[in-house]
Amino acid sequence: MADDSALYEKYPLLNLLHTPPHRPPPLQCPPAPRKTACRRRLGSEHVDRPLTTPCVWPTSDPWTVQSTTSSLTITTSTKEGTTVTVQLRL
């Protein structure tokens, strides 16, 4: 077996058979933020109730913005006359 060292010198990749691969240390993940206490919503809170005075913002652009307690609606028209409405439910 004295020829083994000569064999490893001639074929250095043979060292990989007996050498464990280098493993980098595991990454340390930052701890998760603490969960804040929250209260449970009532069933009546899920209804889309309009505000006592609906909010409509006049703008210089041809945009209409309306909001309720749980949604925001933006409406505009293109130059071609197509009406575009985007509604975001909160």
Swiss-Prot record:
One of its GO terms (cellular component) is host cell cytoplasm. InterPro entries: Papilloma_E4. Phosphorylated by host ERK. The phosphorylation triggers a structural change that enhances keratin binding and protein stability. Pfam families: Pap_E4. It comes from the Viruses. GO terms for biological process: symbiont-mediated arrest of host cell cycle during G2/M transition. Keywords: Early protein, Host cytoplasm, Host G2/M cell cycle arrest by virus, Host nucleus, Host-virus interaction, Modulation of host cell cycle by virus, Phosphoprotein. It is found in: Host cytoplasm; Host nucleus. Its main location: host cell. Assembles into oligomeric complexes. Interacts with host CDK1. Interacts with host SRPK1; this interaction may favor expression of late viral transcripts. Interacts with host cytokeratin components KRT8 and KRT18. Contributes to multiple aspects of the viral life cycle including viral genome amplification, suppression of suprabasal cell differentiation and egress of newly formed virions. Induces host cell cycle arrest at the G2 phase by associating with and preventing the nuclear entry of host CDK1/cyclin B1 complexes. Inhibits cellular DNA replication by preventing loading of host replication licensing proteins MCM2 and MCM7 onto chromatin. Within the cytoplasm, associates with host kinase SRPK1, a splicing factor regulator, and inhibits its activity. Belongs to the papillomaviridae E4 protein family. The major E4 form is first synthesized as an E1^E4 fusion protein from spliced E1^E4 transcripts, such that the first few amino acids of the E4 protein are derived from the N terminus of E1. This is Protein E4. It comes from Human papillomavirus 11. The gene is E4.
